[in-house]
Amino acid sequence: MTSRPYRSVLYIPGGRESALNKARNIPTDAIIFDLEDAVAATEKVSARKTLVQQLLVGGYGRRTKIVRINSLDTPWGFGDIAAIAEATPDIILLPKVNIAAEILELGVEMSKYEGLKKTKIWAMMETPRGILNAPEIADCIELDGMVMGTNDLAKDLNIRLDSTRSSMLSALSLCVLAARAAGITIIDGVFNAFKDDTGLRCEAVQGRDLGFDGKTLIHPAQVDIVNKAFAPSSTEIDLAQRQIVAFKEASENGLGVAVVDGKIVENLHVEAAHATIKKSEIIIEMEILTNK
């Protein structure tokens, strides 16, 4: 799993030039340039051209550039790959992945293009079959990350989502477990009510607590709340620093554990503390460079 934060991952319609321009100034960690759901069938080819032109212009800074292509069993999937190779995106996101073989097929196709030699593959986890095959998909050596497609999944499962997402927790947790076992990134699904800040904050915190690395977003107004939810808080940073110091002092005195705030601190807690500090430092560096 990469140490690079993916707190906020914003969907942008791939064929809308005005949105592509605005995205250059949005403080999101990553952008999904969408050629699938956000583009009508009659506009697929023109959207592809528009996106490639804008990616070649650049200006997206250190934001990770992710292109969601159309499935390879559609009339546009292979054409998407051929076209975007020139723009050298960081990641290609494959929608509606059901089995690991689909990732392998994409990897073989991408290997034909010099511009995609360093491009990674992420999978949309948004079908019942895909969820059941999550461990196999996550273990695919070509795969670097997963993204939950909670809207499509809810539709296919015929479930109703409330504020707790209780009807989907088993699917979410299975994918987190598969991703962690494989050591890859995993991103939570979208929150549709983009004007409900309280609801967004609660769902972002829930996703963080479930183990997700970040959350996909449908509106720029959601970025700040989600960035804060998935970043270490000042309280967490302070605790991490004190745990590191206390354990070091305990070790120097021949002890295998320390006590901080009345709780035992072992080596595993210190490893987590170092990860918290490192993540905080990377986020600060990213934000400085992104805002330049």
Model-inferred region functions:
Residues 1-292:
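Expand to "…catalyze enediolate/carbanion chemistry for C-C bond making/breaking, isomerization
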